[in-house]
Amino acid sequence: MQNTDLTVNLDNYDVEVNVNVKKDVAIIYSSKIQGISGLPAGSNGRALSLLSGGIDSPIASHLMQRRGLDVMFVTYLNPVTATEDTVHKITELAKLVNKFNSRNSKLLIVNFELIMKQIMEHSKTSYRLIMLRTFMMKFSEALSERYNLDILITGDSLGQVSSQTSKALTIVDNASPMFIARPLVGLDKIEIIAKAKEIGAYDLSILPGNDMCSNFTPTNVAINPRADEAIESFKNIMGSIEDYDQLVEDMIEKHITVVEL
């Protein structure tokens, strides 16, 4: 040991050296790298995320993973309008976000044509998109029961599009008693895009391929839907289906493609 008479300025230092002493090892480091932070995925339960081919839903899924959820994915498609590019893009987005799960998950690709047909025939035109989202929630609830999932996740951002106004979201919420997490609800598009670039989802999300909502949107969407008119459309659709519960069971068994991630 040698006394060099050197001094240390603890208030205005040039380099900070940290020492983390464990039982059998000591770790010495001078820099820290920020990780994704949050809670360990899977520590807070499991969720079903409604995944589209857009920018929002993958980020919503990832943010809820950071709050301790393992996430399974579902996408609703019409085989008449869904292209191979659309299916490929959604699958790749699911694979990307799945990397942040604590275990490998699944993507459920639902052929929603049977229910879409009833919506087209029995809903007021301006309420079609709201009814589509309503029945997606109802079907997602059934899937959650089948796979023992705790909550639903959507990429809704308040006021971003006509079907995401406060009144429209309230109507959709009534479709299921399950908690619907909307982690993007207060973010604007610039913030969402920044997060998409952060996890590498942005370039995938902007590839060609329309989701079902974009193909199903009428020219006159109800921006401020009335609850009584929404209930009327809902009852008309349900009345046109002979046995809704049986239809759901049949669709789960015969109209879903399961992709292991």
Where are these regions (language model features)?
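RNA-binding accessory domains that recognize and position tRNA/RNA substrates
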Residues: 1-48, 61-106, 174, 222, ...
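Active-site adenylate/phosphate-handling loop in enzymes that bind or generate adenylated species
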Residues: 1-7, 32-44, 116-117, 121-194, ...
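General small-molecule cofactor/ligand-binding pocket signal
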Residues: 9, 108-110, 181
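Cofactor-binding loop segments of dinucleotide-utilizing enzymes, especially the Rossmann-like FAD-
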Residues: 52, 76-78, 112
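Hydrophobic/small residue at the entry helix of a nucleotide-binding pocket
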Residues: 55-56
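Short, conserved beta-strand edge motifs with alternating hydrophobic and charged residues
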Residues: 74-75, 107-111, 150-156
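S-adenosyl-L-methionine
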Residues: 95-131
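Short hairpin/turn module used for nucleic-acid contact or packing/dimerization
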Residues: 161, 168-261
